[in-house]
Design a protein with these regions (language model features):
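Bacterial Sec-dependent N-terminal signal peptides
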Residues: 1-22
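Alpha-helical interaction segments
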Residues: 4-5, 47, 294
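Zn2+-dependent metallopeptidase catalytic core
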Residues: 54, 288-316
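Auxiliary tRNA-acceptor-end handling modules of aminoacyl-tRNA synthetases
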Residues: 22-289, 298, 321-338
Length: 338
């Protein structure tokens, strides 16, 4: 009986620490698109998942690189861009990447379901549910961050630079650029790879080519609403397009759908040939850019406004200096980084 009492008491303290939403020397709470907290004593990040079966954007990237153009693992390099969602299975949450290549654009739920079942999805990661608070599930997010998502090991091996593996004892969460905003959350981790350097490229750039470290970045980003109107791709336009197979297409139509990638602009007054827009495209210039480069960037980027005005959108493309109180990692700001 006494054993059960103490066990219950210990578990209670564990749960309180995991789900704590206060900031102190042992806990740092982040509130945003996803809430999460960092526990210093455990050296872990616990994510609060309140969005089950809701799509969002997941992007991984490298904050720091290796410094070799030939290897191609560079500072700021984007990795994969994926539409993902959390799904609950028993006492697990799985981070699932639905198959966007094969779809059924239809109001017929059975038709949509048939196509979804015909093609494989990808489970990116699995998490044990540590605690449930109403409709919020708490998971240990740390192992997800401390993995080789960017594929550094595979890249080095393919270029015959050596066989490396991730050394977790020399890896750690990086809190400096781990942040939360209303529409996105950002995470970083320093990853150290150990192995026997075999290639000239890796040997020429790292202080110790048998131990190389990079900082890997992860972004979870809220998707916009469904009011965007897609536009068919015309090969004469020179536009960039995205494509997928639509199995709900009428038999006389092409099953391969192509839509251009474009900005979302809406006129305030659609009856006018020239009208201001509801929400302009605004790019913010890094205030750290020196002169005369800053002015050149401002003038060059602002030139695009002429192109938009030529097709009837007034003041649709704007360039401003990033405000002092704005964070360039907040996805509400499009930043031209110096």
């Amino acid at each position: 009986m006494r054993y059960n009492f103490f066990l219950t008491l210990i578990l209670s303290f564990c749960f309180v620490s995991v789900s704590a939403q206060n900031n102190n020397e042992n806990n740092k709470f982040f509130s945003g698109f996803f809430n999460f907290n960092y526990q210093l004593k455990l050296d872990k990040i616990f994510l609060e998942v309140d969005k089950i079966n809701e799509d969002f954007l997941y992007i991984n990237s490298l904050t720091t690189g290796l410094g070799s153009n030939d290897i191609g693992l560079d500072r700021g390099q984007l990795g994969n861009e994926r539409i993902v969602k959390f799904r609950k299975y028993g006492n697990k949450l799985l981070l699932v990447q639905p198959n966007q290549n094969f779809r059924a654009i239809s109001n017929n739920a059975s038709e949509v379901n048939s196509v979804e079942q015909a093609f494989a999805n990808s489970v990116i990661f699995g998490f044990e549910i540590i605690e449930k608070k109403e409709d919020v599930y708490i998971i240990d997010f740390t192992p997800f961050l401390l993995q080789d998502t960017h594929g550094v090991i595979k890249r080095l091996k393919s270029l015959k630079q050596g066989a490396y593996k991730l050394d977790l004892s020399k890896s750690a969460l990086e809190l400096k650029r781990t942040k939360a905003f209303p529409n996105n959350v950002e995470f970083e981790a320093l990853l150290t790879y150990v192995g026997n350097a075999e290639g000239r490229l890796i040997s020429s750039i790292a202080p110790d080519p048998n131990n190389i470290s990079v900082i890997q970045h992860h972004s979870f980003i809220k998707l916009p609403d469904n009011n965007y109107k897609s536009r068919n791709f015309d090969p004469r336009s020179g536009a960039i397009f995205t494509s997928f197979m639509d199995y709900a297409s009428p038999v006389q139509d092409q099953i391969n759908k192509k839509y251009i990638i474009r900005h979302r602009l809406k006129k305030i007054n659609s009856d006018l040939d020239q009208s201001d827009v509801v929400e302009p495209i605004i790019y913010y210039l890094d205030p750290g850019a020196p002169e005369p480069i800053k002015s050149a960037l401002m003038d060059g980027a602002s030139w695009w406004n002429e192109a938009f005005e030529a097709i009837g959108f007034k003041n649709a493309f704007q360039v401003k200096i990033l405000p002092d109180d704005a964070d360039p990692m907040d996805c509400r700001y499009n930043v031209i980084q110096w």
